[in-house]
């Protein structure tokens, strides 16, 4: 939920009227990528128990694909229908709704492909020109991570430090090797490739597997990381605006900054859970809709951005609108979850019946 809210907050600040007024579009874009990196780490943290319970690799993949693809497709269809109606007479927003590709462009394959979480670089490579509609660029990456998770989990169990170092080296290699592809416009962005983002997912797996050992040295780790980050802050202030890739979460160099920050965030949440379990338990009650929130938030923010003059709002008005948008996202996500859950459970029951 924290990662979802931070992404919503960053995308809200990147809307027209904020980016020009406060010149924060680039900074917020980088913070949003950092939040999605946190989302990858959380996904890795939660995947280890599923891998441990795995009895069959085939069944594991089926279950994970259903858990990811069914909510994605339901959100795609419901939001596409709603947005198509909302933007029926708005030419500026038609290109953001996939259904218009079928209604006016006859690009039926684009619409069908958009119903499944596919890496946008694959879509770009195939030249399908589909809209960034549901879940943005990272849902296809999550699916790829799930497919790699049994292998990554074994690596994390047997050699955590070596496997993390190898994943970072692989990230650097792929990122640099695809430089020419990005210049030739063959891929969307190098940093959104699955192989480039593996370290964050693997780091989450390692945090779960070795959480008890890390708990024993938590104090020393926190002090060491804070000293390290303080040194980076001094460098950041002295060289502002930063020219290097170290402070850009889209570049593999940023792993040396984002991974320690992710550990601090995980530790902070653990401390909050120990400090006030009841409050955190209430907050975690929203976690069931966090996936739907990540899928629908960009479309809802688009709708408000298109309808409201953000630049003309007062400071109070902008804060109030953020609260309204967040509330709408929560309500819509709950409704989407209610639509998706029966379909998802039906597919899972069919799968279990087939297995037995």
Locations of the language-model features?
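Membrane-proximal cytoplasmic C-terminal regulatory module of class A 7TM GPCRs
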Residues: 338-356
């Amino acid at each position: 939920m924290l990662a979802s809210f931070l992404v919503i907050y960053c995308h809200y600040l990147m809307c027209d009227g904020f980016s020009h007024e406060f010149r924060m579009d680039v900074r917020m874009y980088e913070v949003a990528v950092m939040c999605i990196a946190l989302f990858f780490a959380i996904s890795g943290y939660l995947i280890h128990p599923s891998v441990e319970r795995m009895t069959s690799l085939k069944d594991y993949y089926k279950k994970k694909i259903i858990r990811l693809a069914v909510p994605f497709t339901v959100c795609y269809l419901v939001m596409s229908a709603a947005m198509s109606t909302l933007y029926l007479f708005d030419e500026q927003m038609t290109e953001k709704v996939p259904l218009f590709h079928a209604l006016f462009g006859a690009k039926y394959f684009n619409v069908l492909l958009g119903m499944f979480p596919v890496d946008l670089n694959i879509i770009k490579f195939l030249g399908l020109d589909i809209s960034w509609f549901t879940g943005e660029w990272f849902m296809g990456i999550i699916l790829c991570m799930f497919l790699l998770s049994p292998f990554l989990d074994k690596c994390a169990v047997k050699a955590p430090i070596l496997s993390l170092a190898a994943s970072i080296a692989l990230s650097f290699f792929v990122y640099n090797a695809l430089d020419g592809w990005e210049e030739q416009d063959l891929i969307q962005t190098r940093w959104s490739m699955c192989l480039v983002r593996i370290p964050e997912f693997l780091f989450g797996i390692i945090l779960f597997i070795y959480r008890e050992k890390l708990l024993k040295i938590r104090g020393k780790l926190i002090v060491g990381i804070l000293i390290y980050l303080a040194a980076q802050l001094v460098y950041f202030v002295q060289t502002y605006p930063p020219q290097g890739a170290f402070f850009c979460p889209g570049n593999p160099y940023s792993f040396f900054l984002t991974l320690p920050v992710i550990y601090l965030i995980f530790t902070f949440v653990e401390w909050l859970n120990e400090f006030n379990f009841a409050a955190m338990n209430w907050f975690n009650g929203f976690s069931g809709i966090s996936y739907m929130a990540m899928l629908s938030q960009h479309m809802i923010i688009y709708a408000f951005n298109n309808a409201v003059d953000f630049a003309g709002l007062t400071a109070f008005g902008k804060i109030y609108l953020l609260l309204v948008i967040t509330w709408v996202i929560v309500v819509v996500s709950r409704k989407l979850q209610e639509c998706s859950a029966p379909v998802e459970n039906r597919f899972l029951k069919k799968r279990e019946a087939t297995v037995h």
